[in-house]
A protein has these predicted regions:
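Active-site acidic/histidine proton-transfer and metal-coordination neighborhood
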Residues: 29-30, 36, 70-74, 87-189, ...
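Glycine-rich, proline-tolerant flexible connector loops at the mouths of alpha/beta enzymes
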Residues: 46-68, 125-132
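Short, well-ordered coil/turn segments that N-cap beta-strands
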Residues: 10-15, 39-41, 72-79, 116-119, ...
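Boundary/entry segment of secreted carbohydrate-active catalytic domains
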Residues: 5, 9-26
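Active-site beta-loop-alpha junctions enriched in small/polar residues
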Residues: 18-22, 46-50, 83-86, 126-128, ...
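C-terminal helical cap(s) of enzyme catalytic domains, especially alpha/beta-barrels
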Residues: 270-291
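H/E-rich (His + Asp/Glu) clusters that bind or coordinate divalent metals
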Residues: 239, 246, 253, 257-259
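Acidic/histidine-rich catalytic cores of soluble enzymes
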Residues: 12-14, 43, 136, 143-240, ...
């Protein structure tokens, strides 16, 4: 059975849904069904720093089969992973024990992705998160990135840096510094529209010009709303992200996979929030796709 291919053929792109936009109490099947009913093409799984989410990387075969069964029954894939577990165990941590644990998480995440047919992992762009960065942490970060890229190459899984809310890697240009250092076809950039928009105010550089610095290396894009100085839980359409312009630029750069990133915050009508987000984001993406078709013609 071909899962999710219809959307690619009809629209030329795929729009995924961030897992944390739904209640944590839902089963795998319920999450995939909710995404499908709201009009999304796939779900991006979250592997954050909590013990509960990190435990997913240690799943037994029976648990993995539950996920595969849910994907078969719904016709919706878990198409990518947002791996933010490195906040707690950074790849550049000065503590070798934490650094080793971070690399275990990296290897397990790649193996987990391979087992489920997931081809993309978004990496948090931090050398360290809870500590101050130093030359030592940056050196360790680069060294472990090289190893991680080799692991990804072995598994055929693409790694992409998220542009973050901290100065270490809050722009595509900064992410590209490390992509160019590692020089692996399996390490690219997976930016966040909300974070880029906030960074543009800090540095006085347009979001679109910053995105251009990643030409040929942007593997997917998080579509997230933000307001100056605030990076999370901003409803679509109430912030300052120019989704139409970002979508058009991403399309021009060859990006065809997008994820709507937003959070479930207890709203009883969370399914309505999913549907609204799908409509809102597809308006920008469909316009970008139409612009792309006219440009080619």
């Amino acid at each position: 059975m071909s899962i999710g291919m219809g959307a690619i053929m009809k629209k030329g792109y795929q729009l995924g849904l961030y897992e944390k936009s739904m209640p944590v109490t839902l089963t795998w099947c319920e999450k995939l069904t909710a995404a499908k009913d709201a009009g999304f093409d796939y779900v991006e799984m979250s592997i954050d720093e909590t013990d509960e989410k990190l435990a997913r990387l240690e799943m037994k075969a029976e648990e993995m089969d539950e996920i595969r069964t849910a994907m078969r029954r719904t016709g919706v894939m878990f198409g990518s992973i947002c791996l933010s577990g490195h906040r707690k165990y950074p790849l550049g941590d000065p503590d070798p024990v934490k650094r080793t644990r971070g690399m275990e998480i990296m290897e397990n995440a790649i193996d987990f992705a391979v087992a489920l047919g997931i081809r993309t992992i978004q990496l948090a762009g931090y050398d360290v998160y809870y500590d101050e960065g130093t030359d030592e942490t940056r050196t360790a970060f680069v060294g472990n990135l090289r190893v991680a890229a080799q692991m990804a190459a072995r598994g055929g899984v693409q790694l992409g840096f998220e542009t973050m809310e901290t100065a270490f890697m809050d722009t595509v240009e900064k992410a590209m510094y490390y992509v160019d250092l590692v020089r692996s076809p399996y390490l690219g950039v997976y930016p966040d529209s909300g974070n880029l928009t906030n960074a543009s105010l800090i540095y006085g550089k347009s979001v679109l010009d910053d995105m251009e610095t990643g030409r040929g290396h942007i593997i997917a894009l998080h579509l997230k709303e933000s307001v100056p100085g605030k990076y999370r839980e901003i409803p679509f359409g109430t912030g300052h992200v120019d989704f139409a312009a970002v979508a058009k630029k991403a399309w021009a750069l060859g990006v065809r996979r997008y994820v709507g990133e937003f959070w479930y915050t207890g709203n009883a009508d969370w399914k309505g929030d999913l549907s609204f987000a799908n409509t809102f984001l597809r308006r920008a993406l469909d316009a970008a796709a139409e612009w792309g078709r006219k440009t080619i013609c």
